[in-house]
Amino acid sequence: MMEKMKDVNWQEEIRKIIIERVRREAKKRLLEETRKLRMEMKSSKIAEMIREDRDAR
């Protein structure tokens, strides 16, 4: 079937697909890491951290 589609640059098409997949995976991992950090921040006492920062000035 690919032989009939000689006008398609298969190497370029495959490269684009792989790059897009890598980008999606990177975004997915970054989002997971961000969510974990946010949950850690929610469990900490934000108001206490702000007061400490103000007092340090």
UniProtKB/Swiss-Prot annotation:
Record's keyword terms, sorted: Coiled coil
Residue ranges the record marks as coiled coil: 9-45
Protein name: Uncharacterized protein AF_1456
Provenance organism: Archaeoglobus fulgidus (strain ATCC 49558 / DSM 4304 / JCM 9628 / NBRC 100126 / VC-16)
